[in-house]
Amino acid sequence: MIRVSQLKLSIPHTKEQLEKKLVRQLHIRPEELISYQIRRQSLDARKKPELFYVYTVDVKVKNEAMLLKHKKGSNVSHIEERPYQVPPHGTEKLNGRPVIVGSGPAGLFCAYVLAKEGYRPLVLERGADVEKRKSDVDHFWETGVLNPDSNVQFGEGGAGTFSDGKLNTLVKDKNGRNRFVLETFVKFGAAEDILYVQKPHIGTDILIEVVRKMREEILRLGGEFSFHSQVTDLLVEQHCLQVNGTEEIPAGVAVFAIGHSARDTFEMLN
């Protein structure tokens, strides 16, 4: 794979203009360009009123070795693709299904990866599913009546669901986790430009659908969700979690992905 950086085009421009610029930068014929993927897009406004987009693009071409041998300048380089790899499985048999506490970003992605690997996770969420949660949030804005467990902080999708779905990217993530997260969001309905724009965000309306589709995929893979299920105690000797003060759920392995607002759960764990 070849990476081309500092590719500047005026705004607006077409896809065809970007491809022509790539071909010129690489000194190849159009038919030698097999495919390309935008990795980064940033705005250059230093020469106002002129505005430019500056791109970093990963390219597949014919005769890559020959091109790299004769390349000129530092804006064309060779890179190795590093897709995210799930850590190796353990050697001991898992006692029961894994239980995940919380269905914010950490909990959802934990459940998604475990479900893909065949572990059929159970997700416990103190709030409501994202559809009911949206209704509760709308009701709060209209009436001022707060549902303490289903609001902008608690419920499926986590606190970011109602903050426009802004994303922070880990530029130096060598394990490909950041790319995996963004590609997963795109898979479930987010706009493809979150993969490369400088300040990506999904948008609350779209994120609600993305979260719902992630849940549906986890369910399809054998996972389970239990909403309005607050973990109220950790019963270590019994290998159980107490839910809503009464119910006991077996949990040989439990992942607490409770975000920053579940202060009562922090106190219970302490």
Q: Where on the chain are the PLM-derived regions?
A:
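Residues forming the flavin
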Residues: M1-Y53, V57-N270
